[in-house]
Amino acid sequence: MKDFTQWEGFNGKRWKEKIDVRNFIKMNYTPYDGDASFLEGPTEATDKLWGKLQELQKEERAKGGVLDMETEVVSGLTAYGPGYIDESMKELETVVGLQTDKPLKRAFMPYGGINMAEKACTTYGYQPSEKLHEIFTKYHKTHNQGVFDIYTPEMMKARHNKIITGLPDTYGRGRIVGDYRRVALYGVDFLIEKKQYDFERYARHGMKGTDFRLREEIADQIRALKEMKEMAAVYGFDISKPAKDAREAAQWLYFGYLAAIKTQNGAAMSVGRISTFLDIYMERDFKNGTLTEKEAQELVDHMVMKFRMVKFARVPSYNELFSGDPVWATLEVAGLGQDGRSMVTKNDYRFLHTLENMGPSPEPNLTVLYSSRLPENFKKYAALISVTTSSVQYENDDVMRPVWGDDYSICCCVSATQTGKEIQFFGARANLAKCLLYAINGGIDEKTKVQVGPAYRPITSEYLDFDEVMERYDEMMDWLAKLYVDTLNMIHYMHDKYNYEAAEMALIDTDVRRTFATGIAGFSHVVDSLSAIKYAKVKVIRDEDGVAVDFDTQGEFPRYGNDDDRADDLAIWLLKKFMHKLSKCHTYRDSEPTTSILTITSNVVYGKATGSLPDGRKLGEPLAPGANPSYGAEKNGLLASLNSVAKLPYELALDGISNTQTISPGALGHDDEERTNNLVNVMDGYFDQGAHHLNVNVFGTEKLIDAMNHPEKPEYANFTIRVSGYAVKFIDLTREQQMDVIARTCHESM
């Protein structure tokens, strides 16, 4: 059993014998049920550094969204010397470390695909290195090349026609969360020792190919851990041993995360669940008289400042899918322990308080793990932050904890994963709205007129028959589920082979559980379309080739989002049916299939590729985001809409059910206190029904319109809104995406 001097004052034994951060937390954290009166404002150092960073962000926006771009150096753990927000003020930074050598400079990351790395440069006027082009086209294969080498013609056709779309075949998959707390608690040498033991454990007689691969992966992980020490040494720190105090704990932990974002540009690069862990160090330092509350808040502010600075070089097609430059540096606060104790500490308040000390921001993607049993003071403080900043999302700890335990992280937008025990294979989305049109048209794409799906007999009747449509749709979903999973299997095989996340996996157990994430787009449109076919009369309008291109729906029909079981039962049926089909497919590395109802801002792109639907949505119009009801469908107010979404069973969509709601301030109350109390009551009722997720926006449509028309106004520089699964600065969205946000329902009544 190890017993480092840095652990003096900490309780427990089990976490010293084996890597078990959860046990360390359980034995040492201090729950807090008081109010927010202890919080401190920003220090002079915070104001100076944040002021400088805001100047750089303004310059970045003026240059078209990119301040600087690397073209000559391949990003890696030891690719750069030290970098600071401002060299002349580096002594002010209590947490140091940049992705490159300059703030907001975007790294060159070719392992996912050289073409994408180069296009990201040329899009913004930078000329990529000819030498690196030669290396990564002649001598070093990339993930992207590997995937396209083995794609079948059917996969290429489905991808091109966007019935499966947003696939991580041209960008890093992300969604793997290293347990960055391990660097602080154990030091890197101890982690290397444990990985070396695992490496030797797999040296046995009669080894198979899977053993060979695992040994190679562990060797890569050990190499990454050694390079982590070199990276930290550049900044003057020795992370070989555990952190001795809160300052070192924050710095060590951040170095672990920095290693991840120096080596991977995944669509989601989550931070994980760190607040309670760091609070333990802070409480010990308070007792020792070596830390003040002002210093503790400064430490959190500076750490969050670093998360706000994370940048990746992206191509235009990526930005269309994930608009506003998100990185999903998702960071969780609150939740309950399996022993019933609240996990809320003073540090959970401090992380939310950064939105007051430094203003609203999309990153980190602050996520409250919500339960009606959380301390009332904390619930009210979190709700107040939502009312004033619209920067926080909420996820139901009561439905996630029984599945993932009480030490899980959110690995992207809304998806849970056990910290340090699991990884998730990210799978983008299947367009179930387009699949419905394929069922009607016998596999012919309604836009391109190409035979994409199986050439089943199309529906030829003038009016759609519900039973016939359901039978054809069931068959077409069979085809889509199999093709979708096969495509993802290829992607993840090649990502492991050519763009392996060694630095992150080094901070995760070797014997890891894997989940296989999929996703659904067009959910509410399918539900409403099926409802229209069942309860109204839907006449098919066909073109000269006999392809259904529009629909004339006559009569009324129940719509999802109004707490009407006739529509809501169809929503449950759809989710259950598609998940059942996915679960029958073979998944890579024995991963466990899950699905999500989540679209990000890609609902606009998906909508462009999708024809008119029986629910009344027309060709090219955006799809409704996530599990949200269709635009204009909600007629009975906010609570009815929430009730409909809450009926979707989380166990059928363990990858998450995203629900984004915008509420007019006047609908919530006359002042912030009344709005805060009412929002807490709404969330208590919503989550107690078993609902999974809620994005909360509190503003009116008129503010969005003014921000769109006058982005130069100072008050809109950091105007942050919640969209499906993340937050974004509104003025960073494209005009088209801004119009989509404005078109969404803003509830004027409860």
Feature roles, as predicted:
Residues 2-750:
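Conserved catalytic cores of very large enzyme subunits
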